[in-house]
Amino acid sequence: MLQWGRVLVCVLWRKAYTAAPFQGKGNIVRTIGKREVEDMAVGAAVLASGGGGDPYIGKLMALQAIDEYGPFQMISLDELPDDAFVCASHMLGAPTVLVEKVPNGMEGVGAVDALEMRLGRKFDAIMPLEAGGLNSLLPFQVAAAKGVPIVDCDGMGRAFPELRHVTWTLFDIPACPAVVCDEKGDV
């Protein structure tokens, strides 16, 4: 059984890749600071529709990332180059485990690092997989640690129970390759 807070999955959704560092089409859409994170946590609770877990832990992790790395850069899909290499980052499992075991914040970074090493490519941006609950805010910490922007989008528009429930499934875009990483860095 997978325990929330112990396992994080990163999924590659785009097949194309740009060898150069991230270059947007124009200006970064917005800077996300502590006030915006607080507001997003409220919205994440509403969009969770009763699922996805409480966004509180994700909010704390995002606020800590702002203290450590500075405000986040969020770009729109329109800003994202067509050949951008993007990773969706999220946790999976029962969110009640987080009551006893808080993530250390490096699970997502470890998963992204492992996926980049396996693919031989660096990601241009990170995106949330779902808009609801904890997973709305966790990718912000990963993006900040990796020094890349976060994309203003998600896989469905709310929380969902299974990975195959994302919009990309309708277009036969696979949820692989994928990586899992625990709090000890085991991949």
What label would you give each PLM region?
Residues 4:
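Cationic, low-complexity basic patches in intrinsically disordered or flexible, solvent-exposed regions
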Residues 10-28:
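Short, Lys/Arg-enriched N-terminal segments with co-localized hydrophobic residues
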Residues 30-44, 48, 56-187:
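Non-transmembrane, aqueous-exposed alpha-helical and coiled segments at domain scale
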Residues 53:
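Glycine-enriched loop-and-adjacent helix/strand subsegments that border the catalytic/binding cleft
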